[in-house]
Amino acid sequence: TVVVITGSNDLGRGNGEIHHEFSGKVVTSSVDENYIGAEVGSNNTAELTAFAEALRWCLKQGGEEEIVIKTDSQYAGNQATGKWKAKANRELVAHVQKLWKEVCELRKLSWEHVKAHSGHRWNERADHLAIRAATNDSPTSLSFWKPGQR
């Protein structure tokens, strides 16, 4: 699940405007056109897949402004940057690292860890989208969604 935010005030409460959001299940079939290397659907492959989707979105949008990806997954952030060595999900990690490098060639890119379940509005929105995608339910429209709502 990816929620793209612009204009966050960096006070840690997830203020700012949603620019784009998307969610879905982890693709594990190598014959699927959307396959990027996940062999199983797990929390880690979901976090890496979401990271990859955010990076792909950055590449499609173009632009020169700095990008900061905020995630509650230290695993995904550290795998994407190559700080941690992949022991599992190697093909998926390699794909994410390739995307990270591509975006870094175009603009300044970093990631920040956001504590999960701590009231960060947009992290809670991402959790809502992920749960709804996993259960094949449509997400609540942003107009009617409230933080903490599953």
Spans of features found by a protein language model:
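RNase H-like nuclease fold core
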Residues: 1-45, 49, 56-57, 132, ...
